[in-house]
Amino acid sequence: SNVTIDKTSQPKRMQEKFYDCSSLVWKSYHKNGVNFGMAYYAPVAADMGKWCVQHKKLVSGGLSQANIQNMKLNPGDVMFETGQKNGRYKGIYHVEMITGYLFYGFDGNGKAELGIQWATGDEKYYPMGQMVGRP
């Protein structure tokens, strides 16, 4: 789904053309009938992750080199960054949407080296093992 975004802003996250990590994901899915349990306001990333677990909407193996190299992750899948002591579900503090793959070249054996393209356009590296949902 196309969501026009201009600026990152947590206070203005639900206004048109503004977003933070969870409202970007929610706005994209909301237009297609998925609202992560909240019809009118984007939940925080941890609550989105909890919804994915409760509704059995997880990708086996999560964010892993095997899932990337074997192209098991789909555009629209969402990665939840965990590990903070923030009192939220599984310590989730960030969510990113996958939009596709990046091709880095070939290794010495001729196998493609792939990475993930994120909806924010940033080429970030996230630690492997993060939870991935497929709403």
What are these model-derived regions, one by one?
Residues 76-77:
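Structural motif
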Residues 1-38, 84-85, 90-91:
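N-terminal capping segments
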Residues 51:
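Residues that form generic nucleotide/phosphate-binding pockets
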Residues 34, 39-42, 46, 54-70, ...:
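Aromatic- and glycine-rich peptidoglycan recognition patches
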